[in-house]
């Protein structure tokens, strides 16, 4: 899932490594397409 997370970062403009896990969890919960 590292690749997916890396792809998410630039899209959401987060750019924070420690936040990756939390963000992915939130995205999964939201079920964003």
Curated annotation (Swiss-Prot):
It comes from Amanita rimosa. There is a cross-link at residues 12-16 (2'-cysteinyl-6'-hydroxytryptophan sulfoxide (Trp-Cys)). GO terms for molecular function: toxin activity. Residues 1-10, 19-33 form a propeptide. This is Beta-amanitin proprotein. Processed by the macrocyclase-peptidase enzyme POPB to yield a toxic cyclic decapeptide. POPB first removes 10 residues from the N-terminus. Conformational trapping of the remaining peptide forces the enzyme to release this intermediate rather than proceed to macrocyclization. The enzyme rebinds the remaining peptide in a different conformation and catalyzes macrocyclization of the N-terminal 8 residues. There is a cross-link at residues 11-18 (Cyclopeptide (Ile-Pro)). InterPro entries: Amanitin/phalloidin. The typical symptoms of amatoxin poisoning are gastro-intestinal distress beginning 6-12 hours after ingestion, a remission phase lasting 12-24 hours, and progressive loss of liver function culminating in death within 3-5 days. One of the few effective treatments is liver transplantation. Belongs to the MSDIN fungal toxin family. Keywords: Thioether bond, Toxin. Toxin belonging to the bicyclic octapeptides amatoxins that acts by binding non-competitively to RNA polymerase II and greatly slowing the elongation of transcripts from target promoters.
């Amino acid at each position: 899932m590292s690749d997916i997370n890396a792809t998410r970062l630039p899209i959401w403009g987060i750019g924070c490594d420690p936040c990756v896990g939390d963000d992915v969890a939130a995205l999964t919960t939201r079920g964003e397409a």
